[in-house]
Curated annotation (Swiss-Prot):
Pfam families: TCTP (PF00838)
GO molecular function per UniProt: calcium ion binding
InterPro entries the record matches: Mss4-like_sf (IPR011057), Mss4/transl-control_tumour (IPR011323), TCTP (IPR034737), Translation_control_tumour_CS (IPR018103), Translational_control_tumour_p (IPR018105)
Compartments, as annotated in UniProt: Cytoplasm
Protein name according to UniProt: Translationally-controlled tumor protein homolog
Record flagged with keyword Calcium: yes
One cellular-component annotation, GO: cytoplasm
Job of this protein: Involved in calcium binding and microtubule stabilization.
Predominant place of localization: cytoplasm
Family: Belongs to the TCTP family.
Keywords: Calcium, Cytoplasm
Chain ranges of the TCTP domain: 1-168
Amino acid sequence: MLVYQDLLTGDELLSDSFPYKEIHNGILWEVEGKWVVQGAVDVDIGANPSAEGADEDEGVDDQAVKVVDIVDTFRLQEQPAFDKKQFVTYMKRFIKLLTPKLDEEKQESFKKNIEGATKFLLSKLSDLQFFVGESMHDDGSLVFAYYRGGATDPTFLYFAYALKEVKC
């Protein structure tokens, strides 16, 4: 199994069990998330509750919770939304921090294509949810989520160059 860690913080953000599609010349990865239900285990013990006069589960408090699989698996932490000025400030700092961590070939490609990806994200800014890794480090990479027109499950966007592949 491959795990993808944030190159800036070491937080685990994704794994190969979630297929991705490269967009914007490979700068962004698009990953489909899914809402899943946690808890609410229905255990059949073979009894016949209607014959025993128990129409309800007495003393059972299942606490079923709906969560997004990617957010839950990698313990992503949601952040307040950014306005345009905050986002541009974040991107400048992110580019400054990430660029020296890339090899020369990747630096060239990153510098050439990050502007288009930034414009794409700015065009969706009001629809985005913002997440960071478990450490909630200020200098970490952001993970973005949005809902495509009519979709019930979120689509996540990752900065591909900010991910380090680690074999588990």
